[in-house]
A protein has these predicted regions:
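One-carbon transfer enzymes
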Residues: 1-205
C-alpha cells in the first residue's frame, strides 16, 4: 500500500548528516512532499543534531551506552518514532544496526543509502572511505549509489534505486568519495519524492 503523502520521516544519523540536509533542503524547497518529524542520533556530538535544530526538527540522542543495552535502545527508538508519528525511517549515515523491534514495526519502511552499487562493496565494515578504496582496489570502471530497504543484515535489503558514477583515471579514494556524495545528495531526495508520489511501491520490492 502506498505511503500517504506528505511522508512523515524520522531520520537516524551518527555524524554529519549531509544526506539528511539534502532531504531537508528538498522539503523546504517544495520539491519533496514530506515532513521531518524527528532526528535520532546515537552520537551526542553529531552535527546532524545541530542541523535538526536549525531546521526546527526535534532532535534526540539515543545510544546503547547511555541506555544500558541494545535492547533498551531499540525500545526507546521505537517509542520515539511512534511518538512523533513517523511513517518512514530514513537512515542517513547511521552507523549502527537498526534493532529488531524497529524493523518489525516498520516492515519495508526503513531506508538506507550506500555509496556503491550493491551488492558489490557492501556489508559489515564497508562504510565511508573504505568503500571507495575497495572500488579502486578492485579496478572497477564505475561505482555508484544504492538506496535500499533495511533488514537484519548490513546492506542486504531489496534495492529501491541506484545511480551510477564513472571511475575516472587517476581517481583517489577521496576524489571518488566526493563525486559519489554529490550523487547521494541527488538520489536520496529524488527516491523519496518518487515514493511519496506512488511511483515506487516499497511493498512490491
Amino acid at each position: 500500500m502506498p505511503l500517504p503523502a506528505p511522508l512523515a520521516i524520522g531520520f537516524l544519523a551518527s555524524h554529519g548528516g549531509s544526506n539528511m540536509q539534502a532531504i531537508l533542503d528538498a522539503i523546504a524547497a517544495g520539491a519533496l512532499p514530506a515532513e521531518a518529524r524527528i532526528v535520532i542520533c546515537n552520537n551526542s556530538g553529531a552535527r546532524a543534531l545541530e542541523r535538526a535544530r536549525v531546521a526546527g526538527v526535534p532532535g534526540l540522542h539515543l545510544s546503547a551506552a547511555a541506555l544500558g543495552s541494545e535492547e533498551a535502545l531499540d525500545r526507546a527508538m521505537l517509542e520515539a518514532l511512534r511518538g512523533h508519528g513517523v511513517g518512514l525511517v530514513v537512515c542517513a549515515g547511521y552507523m549502527r544496526k537498526v534493532g529488531p523491534r524497529v524493523l518489525a514495526a516498520y516492515v519495508r519502511r526503513v531506508l538506507n543509502i550506500h555509496p556503491a552499487l550493491l551488492p558489490r562493496h557492501g556489508g559489515k565494515g564497508m562504510y565511508g572511505i573504505r568503500v571507495h578504496e575497495a572500488v579502486l582496489a578492485a579496478g572497477e570502471r564505475e561505482t555508484g549509489v544504492t538506496v535500499h530497504l533495511v533488514d537484519e543484515v548490513y546492506d542486504h535489503g531489496p534495492i529501491v534505486a541506484q545511480a551510477r558514477v564513472p571511475v575516472q583515471p587517476g581517481d583517489t579514494p577521496e576524489a571518488l568519495q566526493a563525486r559519489v556524495l554529490q550523487t547521494e545528495h541527488r538520489l536520496y531526495p529524488e527516491t523519496l519524492r518518487r515514493i511519496a508520489l506512488g511511483e515506487i511501491d516499497l511493498d512490491a520490492l
